[in-house]
Each structure stands twice: as C-alpha cells, then as structure tokens.
Amino acid sequence: DGNTGITVLSVPVDEIDNDTMNLISVAVLGNSLAITQGTLALAVGSPLGTNYSILTGNITSSAYSISTIDANYDIFTTDIVGSKNGSGALINLNGEVIGLVTQGYSSEGDQNTLTAISISELKPVIEMLSNNKDIPYIGLEITTVTNTIAKENDIPKGVYIKEVKMDSPAMAAGLQ
C-alpha cells in the first residue's frame, strides 16, 4: 500500500523446512485504541536504521492523527530515540503489535524520536492486502472541518480537500 508503506509477503508453507517453521511465531496484532501516555513500548525491527535492533521507551501521546491520501490515521509519539531511517513495529509488554513505526511525523525538535501508526487503524489495510485485494484509491487528502475550525475561519463545516493527486479518479471527476 503506497499510503502506509505496508507490504504483505507470503511464502508457500510447503517451501519452508521444518527447522525454519519451528522458529516462526505469529505476531499478534493488539488493540491500540486503549493506549495512553506513559504506556511502555518496545520498538523492534530496525528502529536504529539497522536490522535486528530493539529500543524501549514510552508512548508520549496518542492524541495525534495524520492525513494521507485517502486515509487519516491515529499515530503515537514516543520518547524512543531512533533513526530517521528507522522502521519496524511497536510492541506492548504483552508482546502484541500496537503500531508500525513510520517516519516524517515527529515534531520539529524531535526528528529522531519514533512515531507509529496505530495498528487498530491498519488492521483493515493488512486484511485487504493479505487477501490480495486492492486498496481503494480516490486520490484525495482531506481534513475534517469541525464547528470550531468553521467558526474561526468562516468556512462551512464538513470536509476540506487539502490535496488532489495528479491523474487520480478525484482529479478526473473534477474535484479541487
């Protein structure tokens, strides 16, 4: 998926030898909706930009969301200092995946602290990709105009189109 950077790979089970199969365990996708500030977390994978690294820290906020093309996702900020090239999974103390490390959403002063997209938000995307289904594509980046924003900016409440991707169905339909 181009928006999230998630790729689902599959390998036929009959091509995996028994020794390797015994080393494989399933990553349990947890519920990230109840994650709060102060929750302990592990960043595993390559949070330092190199494979097989693990870092520990705390969730510093779960109150942010990001707008991407055709989706909005809740993100966690952490106090885990990693690499701007870092990636991997954010794991809770029960060993469950609660987020996928993403880049580009840290605040200006915290460029190397890790952020992660909430796994609960990504489960539908993972399920669609796992079932070899296409992710619907419209080509819009939108934001919600709340009552407060509408009053402050003297604009109607609803949805505001921030960006229309070139050559997208949204552009073909004439949306601006």
State where each predicted segment sits.
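Conserved active-site neighborhood of the chymotrypsin/trypsin-like protease fold
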Residues: D1-G45, G49-Y52, I80, K84, ...
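Gly/Ser-enriched beta-turn/beta-hairpin loop segments
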Residues: G2-T4, E15-M21, S62-F76, M128-I135, ...
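C-terminal cap/linker of serine protease catalytic domains
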Residues: V97-P156
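PDZ/PDZ-like domain micro-motif
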Residues: N85-G88, T146-K151, K165-Q176
